[in-house]
């Protein structure tokens, strides 16, 4: 009986630690990525490297980079990786 309660405690502890780390990662992404509101669709439609989203976020918004999610452009203020 004692072994079962220790196992249950260990499982709940692991789940708690995993969920707290995931929320911390999501919060960091929200701080880093800001939507480029006035970006035309062509910023993410053109298949060039690095994308127009990446280039214009760096030039006009002062970001380190930019990423496309579908046809939406997001300026990345934490990372300069073009993907």
Curated annotation (Swiss-Prot):
Chief place where the protein resides: secreted
Keyword ATP-binding among UniProt keywords: no
Secretion signal, residue range per the UniProt entry: 1-27
The keyword Nuclease appears for this protein: no
UniProt-listed SUPFAM superfamilies: Scorpion toxin-like
One Pfam family per UniProt: Toxin_3
GO cellular component: extracellular region
GO MF term set: sodium channel inhibitor activity
Highest taxon of source: Eukaryota
Site feature location: Reactive bond: 47-48
Sorted UniProt keywords: Antimicrobial, Disulfide bond, Fungicide, Plant defense, Secreted, Signal
A single BP term in Gene Ontology: killing of cells of another organism
Family label: Belongs to the DEFL family. Protease inhibitor I18 (RTI/MTI-2) subfamily.
Protein name in UniProt: Defensin-like protein 194
Organism encoding this protein: Arabidopsis thaliana (Mouse-ear cress)
Chain's gene name: ATTI3
